[in-house]
Amino acid sequence: MRGGSRHLSNEEDVSGCEDCIIISGTCSDQSSDPKTVPLTQVLEAVCTVENRGCRTSSQPSKRKASSLISYVQDLTGDGDEDRDGEVGGSSGSGTPVMPQLFCETRIPSKTPAPLSWQANTSASTPWLSPASPYPIIDLTDEDVIPQSISTPSVDWSQDSHQEGMDTTQVDAESRDGGNIEYQVSADKLLLSQSCILAAFYKLVPYRESIYRTLEKARVRAGKACPSSPGESLEDQLKPMLEWAHGGFKPTGIEGLKPNKKQPENKSRRRTTNDPAASESSPPKRLKTNSYGGKDRGEDEESREQMASDVTNNKGNLEDHCLSCGRKDPVSFHPLFEGGLCQSCRDRFLELFYMYDEDGYQSYCTVCCEGRELLLCSNTSCCRCFCVECLEVLVGAGTAEDVKLQEPWSCYMCLPQRCHGVLRRRKDWNMRLQDFFTTDPDLEEFEPPKLYPAIPAAKRRPIRVLSLFDGIATGYLVLKELGIKVEKYIASEVCAESIAVGTVKHEGQIKYVDDIRNITKEHIDEWGPFDLVIGGSPCNDLSCVNPVRKGLFEGTGRLFFEFYRLLNYSCPEEEDDRPFFWMFENVVAMEVGDKRDISRFLECNPVMIDAIKVSAAHRARYFWGNLPGMNRPVMASKNDKLELQDCLEFSRTAKLKKVQTITTKSNSIRQGKNQLFPVVMNGKDDVLWCTELERIFGFPEHYTDVSNMGRGARQKLLGRSWSVPVIRHLFAPLKDHFACE
């Protein structure tokens, strides 16, 4: 089914391709006479800023299939035609050579309904001619792992017309198995216009993408670049960049063409019209990633040897990295018997709690990579497993068997623990907690100062400074615990959040200026404080954001504002009064950012997932000196642990737990098929705002102020803390402060 076409926005232009590609083309001012424009060799690259889980607001790009990116050059000199079929102003033999980009990928659509309508309007969509004279230079790996027949890609040379040569066409398979086509002008996908040059100097994955692409071009061109063992990535890139900027001499463009003597890997270029593709399992059972798209040949050989040794009782799983097969791991695998090497462990810490928009993990549960992922069919499970892990660890042919099963229960749901050499740990839930809280690479800090419990007669009300207060979750929990609050100073810039706190707590909260404008004089005037809490925005820290700026740029820098005011609020050393603090942020952050935060706060975080005390997943890191922060999380009798407990009358839940609820409306839909979680009067329905509030632990209609709509209320809740988790952390404060 062919879909309609549309032009991508600027945001989509940046994320339209997963891999970096090289183009040797020419620069020209299209507004001037082409015959007077000098031909200048340039290096242009198209690359997402972050290879791991590229994601934008317009398309869930995590599921892009392994893209086939090509270089197309006009050698006819006849000029190109625009999207409307009209001949451009440049024609004749003097027409400069213009770069054309072709990218084929598989992207799930969020809106199946419009796709059906677009399918009826695509008859006039221009396509490339089968007899097109434009040579295609494929810069993808020849040894890439072939796609399965259920992950089709499109062969542009078989289904095209000559019109529209100046556009990049992306054929994307929608979630329901249909196809939708996008067209975008190639000059809008160039690095010089769509990417930030500073990213090359700041982001290692960006430089690695450039290096891998240049390395592929160098091998094809037979170019020898001098290198020595131990050279850094920057040192290896320098001569290759000079060669590329010089026009790929001496072979030039011809040297970038693939070797015709090598057989074509047809399984990697299977077309959507291939009858074998139509016989495969439903495409929405599969999920494809760009991360893990690197050559894993050596790792797979190592893992195959490991699996063979363990099967023949010649080796021990705990002596190998379960993800890559290397020996002498530095840590244990939290879910399955086996270890993890340093690089795989860091990847786990960053990506294990990263979820896609359908609620499933973004990467494989075993290796946190995966080119093609298989999703568990259990509605309460968010696990997925990659084809490579199933073939190596469970057994050859397992992946194909799994694709034919519907429903399929993953290896975390099946009662049987052992499947080949993939053996689930008996205590995996405790191991998972330890894995995220005991990092051997983190510094060992001195234990926080302990404050003895104060006799009831000497306790006084608590004084709180709340930074990035949100919707006053801290104040709400303190009141629910019965702790008397003498003053509650809150820094918040969101008008809707301030409205909720002001109305629901009847003016008991004093809202102050932006945190960046608060000085030591203000702290001295408002204080002293007994409790300082806060959680800076996670936009530039979360691995979900492909263009995140990290801890030291963008909103990530606001952490240092918390650190600054925390130091201002700390009592003098000779003052023995109890003083507590807590800082919260997302788990799916880079390991380096986590360690930097711990280094400044001089303590390691604890990881708490709200799934233990509520009906939704919400894993977060908490730093602080609150008493008993690392104690086990236990649900109380009043906690609503299942979705049904949170629903209104006559509404039935389809599942017991829901995935992480974010500020995006589609995060409410569950599972690989994006199902509605509730049934009412025989019809599927989304969660109502009051039900979302119960899931987070808030009272009914807590966010129902100032005529806010459903979307605005969900955004407030999506940025908030889980009330039962904060109650768990604040409960020991009852031994130090007066209670009602």
Curated annotation (Swiss-Prot):
Phenotype upon gene inactivation: Mice are viable and healthy but show male sterility due to defects in spermatogenesis. Male mice show hypogonadism and azoospermia with interruption of spermatogenesis at the pachytene stage of meiosis I. Retrotransposons are derepressed due to DNA demethylation.
Region feature (Disordered): 75-99, 248-312
Zinc finger (PHD-type): 361-417
Enzyme Commission designation: 2.1.1.37
MF (Gene Ontology): DNA (cytosine-5-)-methyltransferase activity; DNA (cytosine-5-)-methyltransferase activity, acting on CpG substrates; DNA binding; zinc ion binding
Stretches assigned to the ADD domain: 309-441
Phenotype upon changing residue 543 to I/N: Decreased DNA methyltransferase efficiency
Active site: 538
Gene Ontology cellular-component terms listed: nucleoplasm; nucleus
Protein's UniProt keywords contain Zinc: yes
Record-listed S-adenosyl-L-methionine binding positions: 471, 473, 492, 514-515, 719, 721
Span of domain SAM-dependent MTase C5-type: 462-740
Impact reported for residue 538 to A: Loss of methyltransferase activity
ZnF region ranges: GATA-type: 320-350
GO BP term, pick one: spermatogenesis
Claim: NADP is one of the keywords in the record: no
Function: DNA methyltransferase that specifically methylates the promoters of evolutionarily young retrotransposons in the male germline. De novo methylation and subsequent repression of transposable elements prevents their mobilization, which is essential for germline integrity. Compared to Dnmt3a and Dnmt3b, shows lower DNA methyltransferase efficiency.
Family: Belongs to the class I-like SAM-binding methyltransferase superfamily. C5-methyltransferase family.
The protein, known as: DNA (cytosine-5)-methyltransferase 3C
